[in-house]
A protein has these predicted regions:
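Terminal connector regions
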Residues: 87-115
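Short Pro-Gly-centered flexible turn/kink motifs
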Residues: 74-85, 395-398
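Conserved structural-core and active-site-/substrate-pathway-adjacent residues in large, well-folded domains
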Residues: 40, 77-79, 117, 215
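Solvent-exposed beta-strand/loop surfaces of large extracellular or lumenal domains
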Residues: 37, 42-66, 397
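Surface-exposed beta-strand/loop patches in extracellular or lumenal glycoproteins
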Residues: 11-36, 227-237
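Short beta-strand elements of extracellular/lumenal beta-sandwich folds
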Residues: 2-17, 214-220
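Solvent-exposed beta-hairpin/edge-strand motifs
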Residues: 28-47, 234-251
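Beta-strand/loop-rich accessory regions of lumenal/periplasmic or secreted enzymes
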Residues: 69, 106-398
C-alpha cells in the first residue's frame, strides 16, 4: 500500500466563532500505510497549526493503526498533514517553533503549567489542589477543589454530611509541546470511612485560556447506608472592581444567556446616562461615578447588589434560575427554560472564571451556582449531582 502523508478531517459538531479551541482526537490508518509516526500539522485555509501526536495502536506488521492528536483545532474542516510531507524522516522529529506548553515540578510537590496565556499552579497536597489560575499575569481564579456531601438515609430531610475530599497523588500523565495532561488521584472521607477513589485529569493546551477537567469516580460505598447528596467542582474568583463593574453570565437554552451586573444600572427610575448603560450592557468599564447623572450617583448605595445565582436543571425538560441579594434573603425567580447549555461565568474588569459542563441537561440532576458576587471573593460551582435534588439512591430496586 502507498504511504500516506495526509488525511482529511471533518468537524462532527458545529462550532460557533472563528477562534481555534483545544481538542483531542484519533485518526485510523490503513494497514501498512503509515510505517512510522511523524509529527503532524493541522492545515486549513488560514495556515498550519502543530499538534502533538502519539501512537495509540499498531497493526500486526508494526505499522501504525491509530494515532492520537492534541492541540488547538481550527474552526472549520482541515487536513492532518505530516509536518514535512514525508512521514518517518529525521526532519519530522525536530522541535518546532511557536507557543508551547511549559511545565515544571516544584520542590514542594506542586506542578506549574504555563500555556503562554494561562498559568495554572496545582498543589496536590492542599485542600484545594487548583491553587491559582492566572491569565496574562492576572489572578482570575484560586482554591479550586472538589466538594461533596452525603446522607445516611435517602429521605430529602436527612442530615447531610460534608465530605473531606483529599488529593493524595499528582503527576504529569502526558507531556507534549502542544498539550500537557496532569493526573490527580484521591479519595473522599466521610463518617470515618475512606470511599470514592477518584481521578481528576487536567488538560492544558498551548496558546489557550481553557483548562479542561475530566473527573472519574469509583463508587465503592455501601448503597444501603450512603446516599450522595452533592458532587461538584468549585473555583473561587477574586473580585476587585466595583459591584457595577462585576458581571454574571449563565447559559440558557437555544443559545440564550442571562447577562447581568452585580449592581444593575439599567431599568432604574433615574437614568445614569446612556454611556453608563451601554458600557455595563457590553461588559465594559463604566465611566467614573462622578460623571453619572447626580440623581443616580448620590443614591448608588441604595441600588441592591445581587450576591448569588443558581441554575437548577433537575429534569431533562426544564431548568429554573433564581437570584438573591444575601444568604438570609429570599430567592427571586429570574428565568426558566428547557435545556440549559450548562455554562456560568463570574468576573470583573480584571478577568473572571467561566465553567461549563458538557452534556449538562443530559446528566440531570445538575446545577450551576454563582456565590459571593457582592464580596471580595466570589465562587463558581458546577454540580455533577445537584444539592437541590433528591439524594442519589443506588439500592437495588426490588
Amino acid at each position: 500500500m502507498p504511504r500516506l502523508t495526509e488525511t482529511p478531517l471533518q468537524l462532527l459538531e458545529p462550532r460557533t466563532g472563528t477562534a481555534a479551541v483545544p481538542t483531542q482526537f484519533g485518526v485510523p490508518w490503513p494497514r501498512g500505510a503509515m510505517p512510522q509516526s511523524p509529527q503532524f500539522d493541522l492545515v486549513d485555509a488560514s495556515g498550519s497549526t502543530p499538534v502533538d501526536t502519539w501512537v495509540a495502536a499498531r497493526w500486526p506488521d508494526g505499522s501504525v493503526k491509530w494515532t492520537g492528536h492534541a492541540g488547538c483545532a481550527p474552526a472549520g474542516d482541515a487536513r492532518l498533514v505530516a509536518a514535512d510531507g514525508k512521514e518517518g524522516t529525521a526532519a519530522t522529529t525536530a522541535p518546532r517553533t511557536g507557543v508551547v506548553v511549559e511545565v515544571s515540578e516544584q520542590a514542594d510537590g506542586s506542578i506549574d503549567v504555563d500555556t503562554g496565556v494561562l498559568r495554572v499552579v496545582i498543589a496536590p497536597h492542599d485542600g484545594a489542589p487548583l491553587r491559582h489560575l492566572e491569565v496574562d499575569g492576572r489572578l482570575v481564579g484560586q482554591d479550586g477543589r472538589l466538594i461533596a456531601s452525603s446522607a445516611a438515609s435517602p429521605g430529602s430531610g436527612a442530615s447531610r454530611r460534608e465530605h473531606r475530599v483529599r488529593t493524595t497523588a499528582a503527576g504529569i500523565e502526558r507531556r507534549g509541546e502542544q498539550q500537557v495532561v496532569v493526573r490527580l488521584e484521591g479519595h473522599h472521607e466521610v463518617a470515618g470511612e475512606r470511599v470514592f477513589p477518584f481521578v481528576l485529569r487536567l488538560y492544558a493546551t498551548a496558546g489557550s485560556r481553557r483548562l479542561r477537567a475530566v473527573h472519574s469516580l469509583v463508587w465503592d460505598a455501601d448503597p444501603e447506608s450512603l446516599f450522595l447528596t452533592s458532587l461538584g467542582l468549585r473555583m473561587e474568583v477574586p473580585l476587585r472592581s466595583a459591584p457595577h463593574d462585576r458581571h454574571v453570565r449563565l447559559a440558557g437554552s437555544e443559545g440564550g444567556f442571562l447577562t447581568e451586573a452585580v449592581r444593575g444600572l439599567t431599568g432604574l427610575r433615574r437614568d445614569p446616562g446612556a454611556e453608563v448603560r451601554e458600557a455595563q450592557i457590553a461588559g465594559a468599564a463604566t465611566p467614573p461615578v462622578e460623571s453619572w447623572a447626580p440623581e443616580v450617583s448620590r443614591r448608588l448605595h441604595l441600588i441592591p447588589t445581587w450576591n448569588d445565582w443558581t441554575l437548577r436543571q433537575l429534569s431533562a425538560h426544564g431548568y429554573t434560575l433564581a437570584k438573591r441579594t444575601a444568604g438570609d434573603r429570599p430567592w427571586i425567580p429570574a428565568a426558566s427554560g428547557t435545556r440549559s447549555q450548562g455554562y456560568a461565568y463570574l468576573g470583573d474588569l480584571e478577568g473572571g472564571i467561566g465553567m461549563g459542563l458538557r452534556d449538562f441537561w443530559k446528566l440531570v440532576p445538575t446545577q450551576l451556582d454563582i456565590t459571593g458576587a457582592a464580596t471580595e471573593h466570589g465562587a463558581v460551582t458546577t454540580w455533577l449531582h445537584a444539592p437541590s435534588a433528591e439524594p442519589m439512591d443506588l439500592r437495588f430496586y426490588h
